Amino acid sequence: MEQLKKIISNIPHEIKIIRPLKKGLISEIYLCNFNNIKSVIRLDLETPDWIKIQRDSEIRILDLNNNHKSEKNILYHDLEKGILIRRFIEGNKFNLNKINSDQQLELLGRAIKEIHKTNYEKDAINNFSNAINRYKEILKYKIQKDPILEIGFKMYEDLNHESYPKVFSHNDLTQENIIWNRKYVFIDWEYAGLNNPLFDIASIISSYSLNDQQIDSLWRGYGKKSDVDDAILRKWIKFTYFCDYIWRICLIETSIYDEKFLNLDDLKKNLSIFYKFV
């Protein structure tokens, strides 16, 4: 708490911490008042350079988003000190309600489509391939010793050569990053950038374990089912699990965390079922 007070005291604005919201692997998040605006402050823990690069990308994305809105969402940031303050978004983490799941998923599909229609200058935003290449560089001495890494990177190489046009994508559509309050709001944009649109769709499918009927509802909202090769989509779904593993191994290699802390054994067991199908 003393460290938190010290950080707050060096921010040239009036800030009052209300309560902690979340402590993650790389950051702590608090509800606060910032100049009498209900807000969220995210304080990065000691983070490796590859995460700082993604934070820089997030700030640029949020600044671009600010330019498209009359009311600014991002209120303050200091990349060097790992500080981000944004308006608090009212709502709840989106949980799939089985009673209304078809309607919910159609609306979610439409919301994802709106992300993918966003038109930013290509040189202003990150490219997902750059992130994968950074992971590959970090893990270059481990890939040949770890079949999961080898399969994961090879799978991405194959998928990245598919003919789908790259679009602006969120690239981290997990349950933690989707909020519902009469519409969908997406948070945590540090991985956002140009990517195959199927990665966002696949992330939703794997995160919520959607069945075929639910996937059809998601596509109805998105409006592109007829153009999609189901085999390619299934491969992207598999890749989301490998991507999670790659990210965790990068964190282990560059931070204080170990395999046990990051529950790597459970993820390895889940990934093992894919080996014979890759």
Predicted regions and their residues:
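Active-site acidic catalytic loop and adjacent metal/ATP-binding pocket
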Residues: 28-33, 40-41, 156-199, 213
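Active-site activation/catalytic loop segments of kinase-like enzymes and analogous catalytic loops
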Residues: 198-226, 238-256, 269
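An alpha-helical support segment within catalytic cores of ATP-dependent transferases
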Residues: 1-12, 118-171, 175, 265-275
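Glycine-rich, phosphate-binding/catalytic loops in enzymes
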Residues: 58-59, 102-103, 185, 202-205, ...
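Short, charged, amphipathic alpha-helical segments
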Residues: 258-265
